[in-house]
């Protein structure tokens, strides 16, 4: 077996955490590795009514038989990492690549203090942009320089590639979404690095020939936090009428809501090299679909929407989320692949 990468197709908050958790429980990876920018993105997973919001530890932590690795491309805030390790009780499984660059208090201050970043761009204020600047200038500290992290250091590419060579399954999760990519997103209203599947693979040290599948996650009603173009954005009143009111996991800011954007989704699927698509929020599209776990039980409206998505992205929709709980999902991978 090789690796599967899961990334966001819009502007983040697509429900990747839920999809990662489901694939982890069903496919049983030996390693769940995290790529992406850093603790500027939050992933939420809900199990048995209990919500977990994580910013550093891979959201697949809910699958207890996998090692949890953070790739060298990810910025690490030691305080956030250690707090999550303690809260989630994953100290025996969580490891950080020794080359990860470190977010220091000065980076957070610079992020929050910059009028350009905080007012114009709408940064999350977590220090990622300024830390990446230091990394590019080759002055950033690395995880190996931080005494508090010494018990958690690893060579992530070595572990991931050895597992793949041994025929074991590795799950790699990204953060944020395609629309926030520094290269392909709605520049300058983007994050501080690329967020596509190729970049996520690079973050954890996996070459393209090792990747078997790329699952791109879209939500029925795309959302974005902060400033920037949003072609299909709907008025807040319209979103409220539909019962869609959401807040960001990290910032607590209200998310902007939009209608499905097939053209953007197609471009995102193309650049990410999607082999499968996951759709979340079908229960927001049609409340009668809440908690449904079989394709046959979806309403005609929901089925028509899924068929439209497949026409737009030209890739099979294999996973359909029908609610926040882990078990509220339709898995069509056996039928469609």
From Swiss-Prot:
Single GO biological process annotation from the record: IMP metabolic process
Cofactor(s) needed for function: Mg(2+)
Keyword Kinase tagged: no
One MF annotation (Gene Ontology) recorded for this entry: magnesium ion binding
Places the protein is found: Cytoplasm
GO cellular component: cytoplasm
Chief location category: cytoplasm
Protein residues bound to IMP: 13-16, 40-43, 124, 138, 176, 191, 253
Keyword Ligase (UniProt): yes
UniProt keyword terms in alphabetical order: Cytoplasm, GTP-binding, Ligase, Magnesium, Metal-binding, Nucleotide-binding, Purine biosynthesis
Catalytic activity: IMP + L-aspartate + GTP = N(6)-(1,2-dicarboxyethyl)-AMP + GDP + phosphate + 2 H(+)
Superkingdom in the source lineage: Archaea
Function comment: Plays an important role in the de novo pathway of purine nucleotide biosynthesis. Catalyzes the first committed step in the biosynthesis of AMP from IMP.
HAMAP family the record matches: Adenylosucc_synth
Name of this protein: Adenylosuccinate synthetase
Species assigned in the record: Archaeoglobus fulgidus (strain ATCC 49558 / DSM 4304 / JCM 9628 / NBRC 100126 / VC-16)
Lineage summary: Archaea, Methanobacteriati, Methanobacteriota, Archaeoglobi, Archaeoglobales
